[in-house]
């Protein structure tokens, strides 16, 4: 029997490239792009219907997301009829992201902010020049 948790876990393996470009990769479920999941047991197996969204109207990832979602869901043991739809509302908001991903993204942005401290590097520094280091463990 395939559960909604199984479906969401499978879809979360599909990484949103914009999250990767931002330096903090997230799957579709973490990003809040899995808009709906329906799982129904039938005599022939589990029918699965999902609705996938994108973050904005101009996003070109809708079709690739849907194609990859179909492949991954079809590969689940016991999957029968798979229906993948694209959400045409384009109403995604940052609040749609899962809370655990929002926290991870927040920590990433804090670290990224610390890494933007300007550092002057002298390529031909003498051995007696002071060494500069930063403690980023805080």
Feature map (PLM): residue ranges:
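Domain-level signature for proteins that mediate thiol-based redox and metal-cofactor handling
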Residues: 1-138
């Amino acid at each position: 029997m395939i559960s909604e948790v199984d479906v969401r876990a499978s879809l979360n393996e599909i990484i949103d490239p914009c999250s990767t470009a931002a330096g903090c990769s997230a799957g579709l479920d973490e990003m809040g792009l899995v808009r709906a999941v329906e799982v129904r047991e039938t005599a022939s197996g589990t029918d699965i219907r999902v609705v996938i969204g994108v973050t904005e109207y101009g996003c070109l990832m809708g079709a690739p997301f849907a194609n990859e979602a179909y492949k991954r869901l079809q590969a689940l043991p016991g999957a029968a009829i798979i229906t993948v739809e694209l959400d045409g509302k384009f109403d995604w908001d940052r609040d749609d992201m899962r809370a655990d991903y929002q926290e991870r993204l927040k920590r990433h942005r804090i670290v990224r902010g610390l890494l933007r401290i300007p550092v002057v590097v002298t390529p031909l520094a003498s051995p007696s020049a002071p060494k500069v280091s930063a403690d980023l463990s805080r």
